[in-house]
Amino acid sequence: MRKIKTIDDITKDGKVEFGEGYEFVSTAEEADAILMRSTDLHGYELPEGIRAIARCGAGGNNIPVEEYAKKGVVVFNSPGANSNAVKELVLGMLVLSSRGVVQSMNWVRDNADDPEIQVDAEKAKKAFVGRELKGKRIGVIGLGNVGSKVANACVDLGMDVYGYDPFISVEHAWVLSREVQRVGTLEDLCRGCDYLTVHVPSKADTIGMISTEQINLLAPAAVLINYARETIIDEDAVDAALREGKLSWFSCDFATPKTVKMPNTFITTHSGAGTGEAEANCADMAISELKDYLENGNIAHSVNYPACSMGKARAASRIACLHANVPNMIGQITAILAKDNANVQRMTNESAGENAYTMFDTDEHLDSSTIEALKQIPSMYRVRVIK
């Protein structure tokens, strides 16, 4: 029986199902894996028995992924499962930042006791005249799960859509509308845009990527939208641009001491993925990833280990080795197997950055001494006997 510890409220209705062969436990010390959402695990003392962590959501900033990699713990996330929810909210922000909807509604509430409100509302509406999205130029930074959907939706709205993503995958390139005009540099994307929306992860090369230089390239009174990660935007630069009128509006999903005091903003409570459908989709994907890893050793959508799959574990034995990406690891592994006269049916090795993953099937179960010898290889983080 495999044991799962859940952290956070995974779904709105509380239903989380792994199926036969799994049970939920009350403490992480009892668990084989953790299913979580947004709790910050930095500083968390992870029990040695934890083999994997799956986050129900994109990203992994709340998890010390490299630290866990060195402990042989695979961290999964669920990219794309909440992408439609984020896309819809971004589209809503495009409308709200262009039509004075909230300001108009506030006027109505503030004047609810006015006996002549019908007449006065007609007079007041000219203060909330906005602009249409059709024909306006929008730049989309990042054409992944969310960005590609936003770009395609903006095409459907009749906008002039430009996209920037030097690392776009083949999968997302195929689904991107031919009407989206891809550009080669961030500067070319920003130049003359009426709207700019950001959809990239937080990494060393994306932190602060939207600052004064990029804002100055936008069209006058442009709108900036950030429903990606808080750190992508230089808050001081955005604050100054709003106060100077270079930006007419800023919408983001991250309430910080700085953003909440900026003028002309819509700040939401990290609600981009806040739908029941998105929560369920994320949970389903995370559960599927955990089960495939625990049962078969396969890795998909990990943020600290490479993707790797050998299908279902059908041989007599399957072993997975999590180790540093250094020379001669395969040689050392196969030498130990040869010493035990183990016949390897299939073997695969993948690497990502500093970490690597080796998995193999054998005709017979390996001796405990062979498993122990594998564990003693320098730079070996963990050896799993899957079957």
Placement of each model-derived feature along the sequence:
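Phosphate-binding beta-alpha-beta segment of Rossmann-like dinucleotide-binding domains, i.e.
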Residues: 79-137, 298-303
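A conserved regulatory-domain signal marking ACT and ACT-like small-molecule sensing domains
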Residues: 304-387
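Hydrophobic/small residue at the entry helix of a nucleotide-binding pocket
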Residues: 146
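Oxidoreductase and adenylate-handling cofactor-binding alpha/beta cores
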Residues: 87-106, 155-159, 284-298, 334-338, ...
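An N-terminal-biased, well-structured beta-alpha scaffold segment characteristic
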Residues: 1-79, 211-213, 217, 234, ...
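Rossmann-like dinucleotide-binding domain for NAD(H)/NADP(H)
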Residues: 216, 220-313, 322-324, 357, ...
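Rossmann-like adenosine-cofactor binding region
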Residues: 42-44, 167-259, 274
